[in-house]
Swiss-Prot record:
This is Thiamine-phosphate synthase. GO terms for molecular function: magnesium ion binding; thiamine-phosphate diphosphorylase activity. HAMAP family: TMP_synthase (MF_00097), TMP_synthase_cyanobact (MF_01327). Pfam families: ThiD2, TMP-TENI. Pathway: Cofactor biosynthesis; thiamine diphosphate biosynthesis; thiamine phosphate from 4-amino-2-methyl-5-diphosphomethylpyrimidine and 4-methyl-5-(2-phosphoethyl)-thiazole: step 1/1. The gene is thiE.
Length: 351
């Protein structure tokens, strides 16, 4: 039975336009759906995108499909240089989201007179995609950062010194992929200026830049995330202010604080101190056995911290600890690049 609300367009070209753009929208949605499924493992995104695809498929009527004439389409196969430059998952997400949004806008306009139902559907889905694109991009960015943290065993933490940028670049050249900026002296202007410069270096070497404690500096310097102590703002508050795309690390030294941090949604945990250290003078070292006991059941990355250097890496490895955060053990080295390379190799070595 024919739907009385759907009128066959008198101009065949209108049906062709709608058909082509329904194809575009559905194809773009399929790209987004497959990345949400295989790249991000996000069931919520998959369900939402699949629903949009099914709705458009149901409304891809025969009157539109029968108008298709690829043989006489003089513009088929045209491409643009920007299509070649989609060299990251974020660019693929953005370009295919735009493809869907633009196609839906065309459908909305050209179906308004003869198929008001389709026009309304296109409008509603288009606005949903505007929001979904940002959600996917944020999740994708955070997923990348989480992957770097998961795959890399050495985490470098800074302390104030005159030639810090030079040292950090050497550490990055040594293969370190995570840098945390800890700034306990000076004023906020100097702190921010230094943070911005370190972030530039990290981006140059495709590494993560984390700011210790200071949410405001993390936001202003466009850091990849922030690392919190037990006396800092809580994770849920920081997440609201920081946004969904950034990562949050937490320092903890007991099971209660560790379990709470995991429950509240942190991305990784720093546990320590393992050994005596000048950066945590007032804290009793936990020792290797305690660190292992605290972290063995966790399903997020955990970095042991405190008094760690290349001389005790082997002992940590013997206790099943393979992810470490190091401060002076790298910064005070005569050759930070070689030191980083040696430690990374030692951490990756199977016992």
């Amino acid at each position: 039975m024919k739907n009385p609300n759907i009128i066959q367009p008198e101009d065949l070209r209108i049906s062709q336009i709608i058909d082509a753009n329904l194809d575009r929208a559905r194809e773009g949605l399929r790209v987004l759906e497959d990345w949400a499924r295989f790249g991000l493992g996000n069931e919520d995104f998959v369900i939402r995108i699949k629903n949009f695809r099914q709705i458009l498929g149901k409304n891809h009527l025969e009157i539109y499909k029968l108008s298709r004439n690829h043989i006489e389409d003089q513009c088929k196969g045209l491409s643009h240089v920007e299509q070649i430059n989609r060299n990251s998952s974020s660019k693929i997400i953005s370009s295919n989201s735009a493809r869907v949004q633009e196609a839906l806008r065309v459908i909305e306009e050209f179906s308004r007179i003869h198929n008001s139902k389709l026009s309304k559907i296109a409008s509603e889905i288009r606005y949903e995609i505007y929001t979904l694109e940002i959600e996917i991009l944020n999740f994708n960015t955070r997923k990348r950062a989480q992957s770097i943290i998961s795959k890399n065993n050495l985490y470098s933490i800074t302390d104030p010194r005159e030639n810090l940028l030079e040292i950090i670049e050497k550490i990055l050249l040594g293969g370190v992929k995570i840098i945390q900026h800890r700034f306990k002296e000076g004023n906020d202007k100097d702190h921010l200026k230094e943070a911005i410069e370190i972030n530039k270096l990290c981006k140059k070497y495709n590494s993560l830049f984390i700011v210790n404690n200071r949410l405001d500096i993390a936001l202003a310097s466009k850091a990849d995330g922030v690392h919190l102590g037990q006396d800092d703002l809580d994770i849920k508050t920081v997440r609201k202010l920081l946004g969904a795309s950034k990562i949050i690390g937490v320092s903890a030294n007991n099971s209660t604080d560790i379990n709470k941090a995991v429950k509240d949604g942190c991305d990784y945990i720093g546990v320590g101190p393992v050994f005596p250290t000048l950066t945590k003078k007032n804290k009793e070292p936990l020792g290797e056995e305690k660190i292992k006991a605290l972290t063995k059941e966790l399903n997020i990355p955990c970095f042991a911290i405190g008094g760690i250097n290349k001389l005790n890496i082997s002992s940590l490895k013997n206790h099943g600890i393979s992810k470490v955060a190091i401060v002076s053990g790298l910064l005070n080295s005569e050759d930070p690049k070689d030191e980083a390379m040696i430690i990374i190799k030692e951490l990756s070595h199977e016992n």
